[in-house]
Amino acid sequence: MSKREAFNDTFLKAARGEKTNHVPVWYMRQAGRSQPEYRKLKEKYGLVEITHQPELCAYVTRLPVEQYGVDAAILYKDIMTPLPYIGVDVEIKNGIGPVIDQPVRSAADIEKLGELNPEQDVPYVLETIRLLVNEQLNVPLIGFSGAPFTLASYMIEGGPSKNYNKTKAFMHSMPQAWKMLMDKLADMIIVYAKAQINAGAKAIQIFDSWVGALNREDYRQFIKPVMDRIFRELSAEQVPLIMFGVGASHLAGDWHDLPLDVVGLDWRLGIDDARKQGITKTVQGNLDPSLLLAPWEVIEKKAKAILDQGMKTDGFIFNLGHGVFPDVNPETLKKLTAFVHEYSAAKKTEQSS
């Protein structure tokens, strides 16, 4: 990507609720996944090897910008990246996901956890960001982190879970230890995100993949206070802050209360319905990624409906309701990106005339 190309700040403007010439679009898990170049790379390197080599990681991160024409890049990393450096023995296993050999079972386990020093512990993350921002991208780079609940659920369950029984039992039966764990993880997330911003990330998205397992009462009691602290500390960095979780539409109003800029929605809550619930901040979403496997006519119809709802305010970013599946045709994402740009640009021109 040539440095001489004009910087495309459409995503940043929309995140702040400002007027744009078209609706910005990017896709969760746009980096890697379905791209043939990425698959070829994965034949030789594993996830950890790619993420630890800045040149390779930068290549994977910028591929969708070059191929799809999206308005933002998101760093190619895993939410588990910082955990080993605070003392969590985690391994990413093919076909399973993150596996932790010694799950958290007590306050004593939490007390053993250390602190993250990003420049010392994850220099490869920061070098990747600097490489992208200084030399390769003409769009904003989104940094990210996992959220305390999701990270804690892996640490307590020992890996992926369908019901998070152990996590919820721990939360309710040992509330003081739970708060200690939330605070430890929040400290890590804050310094990790700030380091990404200092290296050049222009926005931060916090992924709470599994928080939809909680009801609103539990979220407000056990999670919301620590999320408020995280976003309050990060807001001083003056970059857009985004919140997203899967199956967590019932928590969208609580996210809106937090000191953040963008509320990410999955496909379960329509944008009009979110607005009726009082969400006035920028909304990001929310095409069901499953539809990317459907014929183009189906995708176009649904994308148009989402755009018509989202464009009722300036604060709208088009995205999926979750990540890109590996079997999605890259040409579909390229076509969808062009459609979002063209349809929204024409509609905005019409609205202003």
From Swiss-Prot:
UniProt record, GO biological process: protoporphyrinogen IX biosynthetic process
Main location per the UniProt record: cytoplasm
Annotated PROSITE patterns: UROD_1 (PS00906), UROD_2 (PS00907)
Residues involved in substrate binding: R29, Q30, A31, G32, R33, D78, Y154, S209, H322
Keyword check for Lyase: yes
Alphabetical list of Gene3D superfamilies matching this protein: 3.20.20.210
Swiss-Prot/TrEMBL site (Transition state stabilizer) positions: D78
Signal peptide (from-to): none
Cell compartment(s), UniProt: Cytoplasm
GO cellular component, one term: cytosol
Pathway(s) this gene product operates in, as recorded in its UniProt entry: Porphyrin-containing compound metabolism; protoporphyrin-IX biosynthesis; coproporphyrinogen-III from 5-aminolevulinate: step 4/4
Keywords: Cytoplasm, Decarboxylase, Lyase, Porphyrin biosynthesis
HAMAP family in the record: URO_D
NCBIfam families, sorted: hemE
Subunit structure: Homodimer.
Family: Belongs to the uroporphyrinogen decarboxylase family.
Family annotation (PANTHER family): METHYLTETRAHYDROFOLATE:HOMOCYSTEINE METHYLTRANSFERASE RELATED, UROPORPHYRINOGEN DECARBOXYLASE
Main function: Catalyzes the decarboxylation of four acetate groups of uroporphyrinogen-III to yield coproporphyrinogen-III.
Protein's name according to its UniProt entry: Uroporphyrinogen decarboxylase
Organism from which the protein derives: Bacillus velezensis (strain DSM 23117 / BGSC 10A6 / LMG 26770 / FZB42)
Gene behind this protein: hemE
